[in-house]
Amino acid sequence: MAEGGFEDRELEEIRRRKLEELQKRAELERQAQIAAAQRRVALKRILTPEALARLDNIRVVRPELAEALEQQLIALASSGRVKVPIDDETLKKILEAIYSQTRREYRFRL
């Protein structure tokens, strides 16, 4: 009968750890959602509707680029290095600059 109590304690400990893990994961997800909402509010303030639509389109195709671009736009706007609101043409120029820095050129020799 002592063995049954030991197994019960083990199961209870496993359940407790699993619950803690789930709670931590839920808290991290909640924090990520809050951060995303704050970024979205900031972007709505610094981008025109057309530029925001372009950013949303980029997010569909290349989410990692959109996230990097969001961070850069927020940094540019908060430092005053770009005039707010950023219109679609300005966003295109920023994108061109990013592409020119990250684009790789391939040369084939025959």
From Swiss-Prot:
It holds the Pfam family dsDNA_bind. GO terms for cellular component: cytosol. InterPro entries: DNA_bind_arc, PDCD5-like, PDCD5-like_sf. SUPFAM superfamilies: Double-stranded DNA-binding domain. GO terms for molecular function: DNA binding. Coiled coil: none annotated. The keyword DNA-binding applies. Keywords: DNA-binding. It comes from the Archaea. The keyword Aminoacyl-tRNA synthetase does not apply. PANTHER family: PROGRAMMED CELL DEATH PROTEIN 5. Belongs to the PDCD5 family. This is DNA-binding protein Pisl_0441.
